[in-house]
């Protein structure tokens, strides 16, 4: 495993780990969910997430402390924010206690990938959920999937935080009273044009 031997070489990117958590919402209820080794998602070409961007996500990290413990910081707050995000996009909230348990299960199943203390690297944890059944015509999906994967990453700002060159434009990422206050995939897609344009200039 590269993190154990060369943590300084890991960037902020995706490296597959052993297991991820998956739960499904169908017929008005979430199932118990569980861990799987399969990193792939199979869905219909007309899935709600593909047609109408009905997806929300969170992000957090697990890291090794100086005394060798593996910890995360306040996953309960991420659980609450995902509930708020889901409600805003008319998605069934994933229960907060099950959210935290899914994080714990995923980290434990991939603890070999948590970088050692002092490397500056961490295990990035990505919980997300999305509408998975076919939807044509603008309306909420009826079936959903909640997933958590983890991947070892180096510092987001490699080499530390440095002064930035700013680019000011009249581009709006989110409209007033819209979805700017939640972690929805559509908000981040809206920022891509501004990011690419800024780097190009």
Language model feature labels by segment:
Residues 95-97, 113-122:
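Flexible, glycine/charged-enriched surface loops at secondary-structure junctions
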Residues 104, 118, 124-133, 137-140:
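Active-site periphery "cap/insert" segments of enzyme catalytic domains
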Residues 4-109, 135-201:
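Helix-start/capping segments and mature chain N-termini
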């Amino acid at each position: 495993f590269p993190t154990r031997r060369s943590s300084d070489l890991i960037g902020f990117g995706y490296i597959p780990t052993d297991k991820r958590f998956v739960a499904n919402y169908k017929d008005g209820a979430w199932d118990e969910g569980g861990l799987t080794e399969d990193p792939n998602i199979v869905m219909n070409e007309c899935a709600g997430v593909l047609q109408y961007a009905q997806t929300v996500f969170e992000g957090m990290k697990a890291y090794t402390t100086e005394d060798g413990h593996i910890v995360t910081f306040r996953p309960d707050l991420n659980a609450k924010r995902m509930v708020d995000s889901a409600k805003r996009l008319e998605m069934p909230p994933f229960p907060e206690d099950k959210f935290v348990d899914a994080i714990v299960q995923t980290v434990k199943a991939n603890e070999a990938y948590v970088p050692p203390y002092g490397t500056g690297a961490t295990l990035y944890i990505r919980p997300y959920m999305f509408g998975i059944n076919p939807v044509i015509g603008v309306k909420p999906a009826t079936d959903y999937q909640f997933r958590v994967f983890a991947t070892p990453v180096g510092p987001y700002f490699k080499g530390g935080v440095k002064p930035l060159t700013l680019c000011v434009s009249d581009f709006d990422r989110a409209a007033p009273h819209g979805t700017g206050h939640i972690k929805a995939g559509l908000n981040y897609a809206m920022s891509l044009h501004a990011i690419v344009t800024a780097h190009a200039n």
